[in-house]
Each structure stands twice: as C-alpha cells, then as structure tokens.
C-alpha cells in the first residue's frame, strides 16, 4: 500500500515486491482502485540483490519487520541497497522489537546517515510508530 500511495501522490514509478505471490493480485487491485500503475514481483528479501536494487532510487517498506529473523534480513537488505547506490531507504513500523533491533543496528553501522523518526496519528485512529531512514 505504501508504494501505491507513492505512485499516486508523487507520480513515482513503483515496483511492489512480496514473497507471497498471492499478495500480487491484491496489490494490483489496490493500484487499480487508486488509478495508478505499478509493477509487481514475487521476490524474497534475500532475492533483492545489489544488481537488482541498483535500478531504484528509493526503497520503502511498511509493516515488514514483524518476526525476529527479519531484523537480520532487513539489515542485510539495507546494506545491499546502500552498496547498490540507493539514495534513501525508509522502513516504517509500529515499533515491534525486531524493528527496534534493525534500527539500532543501522544507526551503529551508518551513524548520522541513519535516523529514526517517531510518528503519532490522532485521526482517523490513534496510532504510533517509527520510520527508519537511511540516507547513505
């Protein structure tokens, strides 16, 4: 959904990626409902190579760090994205422990080039979370 928002709001060229091929038709449906075009691909985090990532300027993810082992996978993905020349990596999460681990690891590795922004919403529902932003 984040990529669909970016396609609509910023007129971005978006490739949506999910490890579960059953998600792709829903992604296409959401894109159609929002009158945007996106490409969809079935890939795991590990399949996003330096070569593959080199075609993107920005990598975004939301609500993708929910299992303990995902912190390591996303840390490695962030490192590959940096090596690929991606200009900005942003990952949003409601602050689950694996995300906090990922954020700490990125801040240690990338120093001032990694920051965490806290966000709060009061409408349409009360919610809070953080966004990890890495700008190599």
List the predicted regions and their residue ranges.
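S-adenosylmethionine-dependent methyltransferases
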Residues: 1-136
């Amino acid at each position: 959904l984040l990529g669909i928002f970016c396609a609509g709001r910023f007129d971005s060229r978006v490739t949506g990626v999910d490890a579960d091929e059953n998600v792709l038709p829903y992604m296409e449906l959401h894109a159609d409902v929002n009158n945007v075009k996106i490409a969809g691909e079935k890939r795991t985090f590990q399949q996003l190579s330096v070569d593959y990532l080199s075609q993107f300027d920005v990598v975004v993810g939301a609500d993708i760090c929910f299992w303990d082992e995902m912190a390591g996978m996303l840390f490695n993905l962030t490192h590959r994205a940096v090596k690929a020349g991606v200009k900005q990596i942003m990952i949003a999460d409601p602050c689950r422990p694996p995300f906090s681990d990922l954020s700490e690891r990125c801040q240690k590795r990338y120093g001032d080039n990694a920051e965490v922004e806290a966000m709060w919403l009061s409408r349409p529902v009360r919610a809070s979370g953080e966004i990890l932003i890495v700008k190599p």
